[in-house]
């Protein structure tokens, strides 16, 4: 931000799920809050996990590769709802610390969107209990 940036246009989060160490909710929360602190009140846009084509989540898919046009983006996340919920809950908690937007990759139809919003609603209920 010191060089005049107006925020973080796209923070890729997939690296947090590298084989051997998948960050839990608290670790993700701490990472996102550190990004928000570094942005000093400017908007941070986080892209949710985007596995497929050139990226895999080995622990979730047990080494199965996605095809180029098949299981990618939001559809990949929706196949692993527990991990998606962990990320969304961490993002929602972090959003209390600064301006944060969430971008779901490769939403192709209303079913993708509705399914993602069900996860968001689940996390909202969980965090307000």
Where on the chain are the PLM-derived regions?
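Conserved alpha/beta-domain cores
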Residues: 1-129
């Amino acid at each position: 931000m010191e060089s005049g940036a107006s925020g973080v246009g796209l923070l890729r989060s997939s690296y947090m799920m590298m084989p051997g160490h998948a960050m839990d909710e608290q670790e993700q929360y701490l990472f996102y809050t550190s990004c928000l602190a570094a942005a000093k009140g400017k908007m941070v846009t986080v892209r949710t996990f985007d596995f497929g084509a050139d990226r895999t989540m080995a622990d979730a898919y047990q080494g199965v590769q996605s095809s180029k046009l098949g299981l990618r983006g939001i559809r990949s996340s929706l196949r692993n709802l527990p991990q998606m919920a962990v990320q969304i809950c961490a993002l929602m908690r972090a959003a209390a610390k600064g301006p944060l937007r969430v971008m779901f990759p490769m939403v192709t139809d209303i079913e993708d969107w509705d399914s993602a919003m069900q996860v968001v609603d689940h996390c909202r209920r969980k965090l307000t209990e």
